[in-house]
C-alpha cells in the first residue's frame, strides 16, 4: 500500500480534472491528543493546518512504464518549481508531502478568493490539468464568445468588498499580480496555466500589506529557455482576462506595466517583442479557425 493511500481515504474529493483529483484534508496527519494521567481531561495540540492533496492518477490509455515516468517527472518538477519560487520570494503554497511513486503532492490550503472570483468571474469550476496547447485553444475560443457578447455588471464579490474595506482598488490588485509574475519569471520558471483561477488573494492581517497574491497549481510549469516561453505565459493570462472578465483591457494593462517594471527593461524588451508576435499568431488563428 502506498504511503499516500490513508491520506487520500481521509480526504474529501473537491475537484476532478482530466489529469488529477484534488482532495481537501483538515490536516496532513490526525490531530494528536494528550491525556493527563489520573485525569479525565485532555487537550489537543496547536490548530492543524488544512492541506490539499493532488493525486495524478494512473492513465490507462498510456503504457504503464511511460505513465509512471511522466507522472514522476511532472510531480517532481512541480514540487521543485514551488520550492524554487518560494525561495525567490514568490508566494506559493508550501509543499508538505510528496509521494512520487503514488503520484501525490500535498500543499497547504490557501484561504481566500481567486482573482477570478474577486473580478466577478463566478465560482470556480472543475480543475482540469491539460496540455498547454489545449489551454490556449480553450481560452481563445472563450475569448471569441465574450467578444460578441456583452455581459452586464454583476454584484460585487465578497472578496472585492473585503479588499475595498481595506482600501485596496482593482488597479492595486493588478499591480500586485504583475509584480508576482515578474518575480516568478525571474526564476526562469513559467507557470503554464496562468489564469485568474490560479491566482489567490489571501488577506494578511498584521503583515507588511493588507493582502498577498498566491500563485497556485504549478502542474504545467516548466523551465523557460527563450523569451517566447514567457510571452506565451503572459498571452494565456491575457486571453483568460478577455474570456472571463469583459472590458478587462485596462486591468491587464496594469498587470503588464508592473510586470515590465519588475523585470527591468533589458529582460522585458525581448519578451515584449515576442508577446506581440504571439498576439499576431493568435489573431490570425481566430480569423482562420
Curated annotation (Swiss-Prot):
Give the enzyme's EC designation: 3.6.-.-, 2.7.11.1
Localization in the cell: Cytoplasm; Nucleus; Chromosome, Telomere
Which reaction(s) does the protein catalyse, per the Swiss-Prot or TrEMBL entry?
L-seryl-[protein] + ATP = O-phospho-L-seryl-[protein] + ADP + H(+); L-threonyl-[protein] + ATP = O-phospho-L-threonyl-[protein] + ADP + H(+)
Per its UniProt record, what Gene3D superfamilies does this chain match?
Phosphorylase Kinase, domain 1, Transferase(Phosphotransferase) domain 1
Any idea which GO molecular function terms this record carries? Answer: ATP binding; hydrolase activity; protein serine kinase activity; protein serine/threonine kinase activity
- GO CC field: chromosome, telomeric region; cytosol; EKC/KEOPS complex; nucleus
Q: Which residue ranges does the record annotate as region Disordered?
A: 134-158
Provide ranges: composition bias, Basic and acidic residues: 140-152
Chain coiled-coil ranges: none
Q: Which InterPro entries match?
A: EcKL, Kinase-like_dom_sf, Prot_kinase_dom, Tyr_kinase_AS
Notes concerning its domains: This protein is considered an atypical serine/threonine kinase, because it lacks the conventional structural elements necessary for the substrate recognition as well as a lysine residue that in all other serine/threonine kinases participates in the catalytic event. BUD32 has protein kinase activity in vitro, but in the context of the EKC/KEOPS complex, the catalytic subunit KAE1 switches the activity of BUD32 from kinase into ATPase.
Q: What does this protein do?
A: Component of the EKC/KEOPS complex that is required for the formation of a threonylcarbamoyl group on adenosine at position 37 (t(6)A37) in tRNAs that read codons beginning with adenine. The complex is probably involved in the transfer of the threonylcarbamoyl moiety of threonylcarbamoyl-AMP (TC-AMP) to the N6 group of A37. BUD32 has ATPase activity in the context of the EKC/KEOPS complex and likely plays a supporting role to the catalytic subunit KAE1. The EKC/KEOPS complex also promotes both telomere uncapping and telomere elongation.
What protein name applies here?
EKC/KEOPS complex subunit BUD32
